[in-house]
């Protein structure tokens, strides 16, 4: 199908709600609803193009593939598995009831050819799509999906640099897309003010509409005045500043050097991983960018990469002023390094700076979705988690804040960070709630690919591993294989998410709590094994926190005694 025909059949997509099945059982129905939920206009960034988030992260290769995926799921039997290759349904095979109902591989290229240039050739020929992380694995839940991880990062930054108190402090960042859009709310929940630069006004308006952002500003002076007033009044607020980060950040550096306001933390979540589709070059307007991406993508890439170098240099300038500065995983430092900024890696990534100790205990982004479409199902599961983990005061605080501040996008969903020994208990509790009728329909449980054992990304999740194993990608492959063997409902293997082609490999997992005894067994296996692979991976790398965790949970790690 050509692009023109594909766009012609585009329509508004929303997942079915309620208890009526459109597929053979709830395991298949879950996939049927979740791919559609990914393209809900309240969820996706550009649903008319099948783009969910992250530049060009898509749910299906084209509209013909999307429609065929839905038809294939409706015809799928409980002992069959659908195979999806880069957003295209390519086969249905007989397996067994405990096998995944869908297996997905997105954007995977042989390493020598794992470049954006080669990917774009294949994409143009209709042979591949970019799945990002949760876009092509059908478990994106809107900006909430990254809020708590960003919140935990900002809280840890406050703990490390400001005695645990971000009151009166402000965070400077950029990017208000599907991932970056979480930053304003996360920062405010952590107690800080946030100034986020964004070049597309529609994205600022989207975050205002979904209550992730408090104010919009059209000039640096206006934005700084709002931030300054709030900081002095000890109020946490967020401002979206319409502008280009490669222009605004250098200006803020010059103002700071001249005695003006200085941020207290600096980071970035622009879509710098994709120089053609994700980053507006300095001096360009949106119309020129849009047309040039089609007519002269190489010129766009060249200009964008040069702008990223300027952007990173400004971040370095702040870093050298003593301001905590951190890369938030979009590979912008790598681009700047390639463009001649030799000290681009002088500031760290957020995982080694703040998050790795959590990974060592198998902690990561546990998310669930109410297939009923009823928000009350989520509120009931919130209460269940509080009862299940009464000692987790931070979890209780998060769930309270989430209920108060986070607007649902599409099917009601929740995310919280849980670790090894906790995720399976949550899954079993949800399954019991479905079984006894407390919930109106089954619950889908998944996670981001950004997790403790499911990703190899040397410039992000696995940056600066203590044993030097940053680029070893056996670990996410093992994670996917184990989750398949354990009985996950669908499993995905992707390449390039977050940081772009050639820089990451990662795996996703989704499992359904449908109230059956069979689901109890699958949930027990998958939601134990999945975080356990993260503990295993970090223990193998030499992290004592992970080794202690492995011992506490009696993991069988055959070489543990021989580890240095």
Curated annotation (Swiss-Prot):
How many cofactor units bind, and how? Answer: Binds 1 NAD(+) per subunit.
| Domain of life, source organism | Eukaryota
The catalytic activity of this protein is classed by the Enzyme Commission as: 4.2.1.49
What the entry lists under InterPro entries is as follows: Urocanase (IPR055351), Urocanase-like (IPR023637), Urocanase_C (IPR035401), Urocanase_central_sf (IPR038364), Urocanase_CS (IPR023636), Urocanase_N (IPR035400), Urocanase_Rossmann-like (IPR035085), Urocanase_sf (IPR036190)
The keyword NAD appears for this protein: yes
Q: Which SUPFAM superfamilies match?
A: Urocanase
What cofactor requirement does the entry state? NAD(+)
What keywords does the record list, in alphabetical order? Answer: Histidine metabolism, Lyase, NAD
Q: Which reaction does it catalyse?
A: 4-imidazolone-5-propanoate = trans-urocanate + H2O
Indicate what this protein is called per its UniProt record: Urocanate hydratase
Organism (species)? Trifolium repens (Creeping white clover)
